[in-house]
Amino acid sequence: MEISPTKIKSVLLKLIQILFFTISISIYIDLVGNSNNKNNINNNINNEELLLNKQIQIYYWFVGIILFSIAWSIGTFKWLSRFFLTFFIIKSIQQLIQHLPIEFYDKLRNLIVFGTFSKFDFTSTGIITESLPTLYDNFFGGNISPFSIEIIGIQSCLIIFFSTLGFNIYLADKFWLIKTIIVDWIISAILLIIFSITDLLMNQSNVYSVISYIFGSNVLGFGTIKIQEFLWNLSSKYDDKLNSTIIKSTKSNNNNNNNNNNKQDDNIIYDTDSSFNGQSSSSSSSSSSSSSSSSSATTTTTTLVNDNSIISEYVTEKIMIEENGEIKEQEVQVDKLDYSKLNEDQLNAILSEPILETQITTRNVSYHKSTRFINNLIAPENINSRISAKEFVGVIILWVYTISNFIISDYSLLTIPNILVVVGFSGTILTYLSTISAKRLTNKNPSKREC
């Protein structure tokens, strides 16, 4: 049995996906484990080694999240995406408890250990009741770096905000516009010019902060997005089952269009005597009108130019259009007047007339009401069944939540450029994936930028 080259490439793509998932999850577990052992590390190394270790962890985080997003873009099963989301939620709850203020951590531990576990008898399992607080601390890693309530509140608000974008296409589109155009290009360019001048005059280095943000947002962020789009196209290209379904659907739509066109052609009556005989023209026109009344209607408008009337006929025809993967019937008006035979005065008279709404023809009115934004990045439509977009957004949000805990816990050890690279990259990835999750990869109407 001969194996097709497409099948071989598809298998290789899946092997790459498994490899990337394995590496990225290992990096994530290692990062969370280093966070749990933070107290022991801090007691054994100086500030320089701690700073180097923190920077290495940030680099690991970048490698992990990029490899994870690339692997996910190749295509995941629904159960696998939900498994990943559940795993990251559990790990994030564990991190949240680690960073609770001390009083809240103690109250939660007492509530869980002495308020819940005390109701059960652990004698048969060999667990001593007095050791339950220790087991609790070992599972959650202890209260390693307490945050203030304000910081935890800001983190929670950002998680809720980006989660909301994943369900609201209007907010996602507007935020994408603000983030990519106003912030990433206009404001960044203005600050780059201002800080370049002030740094030369005052011997400062603020311009590196702006460059770091631009690098994270427009280089790392958009670079990762383009790789994702490439893999979406590649994985759908190698999916024989999905492609065969699309081909069958396309052939079915084309057959429907051909049948409708044939029906319209059968109802057309050609009046060949209209320019030779007035009576035959009149009789032929009446027969044509009666024969085609079921499929078209004729609207006549008259324009007077120097006592010469110009008769324009707008014939209403029904055409078949494709909208959101469905074939729909739509009426359009076609002007049958031969403008090449009109003189200049007649053309000016027609152009000076107000345009009626019935004269405006369009294949899809909703397309003309939409707006096309700059940085128009579109996911392929045939990737619908391959990407669990909302789970994807949720997992990436929790990846960003992990690095935010690293940055906040040792803020004094990191430089502003290092932080801004993370902020720019995270903002671009989350904003883009939110627009994907909101509407592009569902069966709803397309995003505004897809029109």
From Swiss-Prot:
Membrane topology: Multi-pass membrane protein
Localization annotation: Membrane
Transmembrane segments: 11-31, 56-76, 151-171, 175-195, 207-227, 392-412, 413-433
Principal place of residence: membrane
One term under GO cellular component: membrane
UniProt-recorded name of the protein: Putative uncharacterized transmembrane protein DDB_G0281465
Region (Disordered): 250-300
Bias-annotated ranges (Low complexity): 253-262, 280-300
Keywords recorded for this protein, A-Z: Membrane, Transmembrane, Transmembrane helix
